[in-house]
């Protein structure tokens, strides 16, 4: 009799526990869903190319892609949303802490962190290593270095900036597929440099003639906008290119696109971006023809770019072809 009564008393407790567990799970699902909607909204508003391309990302890796791209938008917009570089540096440190906690499995209640943590759990369930903390930090450091829009000393410095931002975002995306491939990373490096250089060129009018703070969007996904607390323009073409073309900042501010030498300077920088696209296409043709890429990857051996041994040349060629197809698919021939 006592046992039956005890059983009756315990049943509501088990029911409450079951309800509590279900409610917690439902809350977690809702939180991830809201984070996904937030990240999609950021891409739709500020980075329409990435929003379009997300349809080509495998469903199993799409949350990681959205989180990576939303992360890039948020840190790119820091300069546009703070009043001075000191506050901007504090925001960048917030993102370092956020990424560090997220990769350790302790994400803060921040939409990008929530979605990234969810994506990492999915990758880990498939036996994939975590995304590189160093790559995330590299993007943050590059953005922080140019918070106040200092000029690029030379064209090589602009390429380095593009490598540390746009190319590195592609490395993170490839890792999330998941794909670890020197060949795919090599192609991504050139595509990222072309994209980053083009982004700086396309952002040039906004930087030289900044609109009122916090009222502009970035539909082209550029993210290279002037600090929100300043109406002072900046010409961010490489100084060596400007000197060679005879471009002066004051002429650009006074005459805009008609400034002496400006078109020649822009053409020189754009040519470098186009060179990287040509190189990527040549690499693709070589690989499809069963040849090697044609030149060495300058970042081979660095973090995340370790070489894999395939045994013999034929296996290496086949692996490279499969990796490029998996990494870029229908996008590369375009």
Model-predicted regions and their roles:
Residues 104, 125, 141, 145-149, ...:
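Alpha-helix capping at helix-to-loop junctions
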Residues 84, 88, 153-158, 181, ...:
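Intrinsic-disorder/low-complexity, polar/charged segments
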Residues 115-155, 160-163, 265:
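Alpha-helical ds-nucleic-acid-binding substructure associated with the helix-hairpin-helix region
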Residues 12-15:
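Compositionally biased, non-globular sequence tracts
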Residues 175, 179-215:
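Active-site beta-strand/loop microenvironment that shapes enzyme catalytic pockets
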Residues 2-7, 17-118, 138-139, 162-168, ...:
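Catalytic cores of Mg2+-dependent Asp-rich isoprenoid enzymes
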Residues 147-187, 281:
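Helix-hairpin-helix/helix-loop-helix acidic hairpins
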């Amino acid at each position: 009799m006592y046992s039956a009564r005890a059983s009756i008393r315990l049943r509501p407790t088990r029911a409450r526990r079951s309800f509590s567990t279900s409610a917690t799970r439902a809350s977690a699902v809702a939180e991830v869903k809201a984070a996904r909607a937030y990240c999609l909204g950021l891409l739709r508003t500020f980075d329409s190319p990435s929003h379009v391309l997300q349809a080509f990302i495998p469903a199993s890796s799409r949350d990681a892609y959205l989180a990576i791209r939303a992360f890039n938008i948020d840190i790119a917009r820091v300069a546009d949303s703070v009043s001075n570089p000191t506050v901007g540096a504090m925001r960048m440190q917030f993102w370092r802490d956020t990424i560090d906690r997220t990769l350790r499995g302790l994400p803060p209640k921040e939409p990008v962190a929530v979605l990234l943590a969810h994506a990492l759990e999915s990758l880990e369930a498939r036996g994939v290593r975590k995304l590189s903390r160093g790559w995330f930090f590299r993007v943050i450091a590059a953005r922080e270095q140019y918070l106040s829009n200092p000029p690029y000393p030379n064209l090589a410095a602009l390429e380095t900036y593009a490598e540390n931002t746009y190319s590195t975002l592609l490395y993170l995306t490839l890792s999330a597929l998941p794909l670890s491939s020197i060949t795919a990373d090599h192609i991504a490096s050139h595509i990222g440099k072309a994209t980053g250089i083009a982004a700086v060129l396309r952002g040039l009018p906004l930087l030289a003639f900044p609109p009122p703070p916090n009222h502009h969007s970035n539909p082209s996904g550029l993210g290279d906008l002037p600090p929100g607390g300043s109406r002072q323009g900046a010409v961010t073409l490489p100084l060596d290119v400007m000197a060679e073309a005879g471009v002066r900042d004051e002429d650009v501010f006074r005459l805009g696109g008609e400034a002496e030498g400006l078109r020649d300077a822009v053409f020189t920088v754009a040519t470098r971006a186009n060179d990287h696209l040509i190189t990527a296409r040549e690499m693709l043709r070589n690989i499809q023809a069963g040849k090697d890429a044609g030149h060495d990857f300058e970042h081979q051996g660095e973090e995340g770019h370790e070489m894999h041994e395939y045994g013999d040349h034929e296996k290496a060629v086949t692996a490279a072809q499969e990796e490029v197809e998996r990494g870029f698919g229908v996008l590369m021939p375009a």
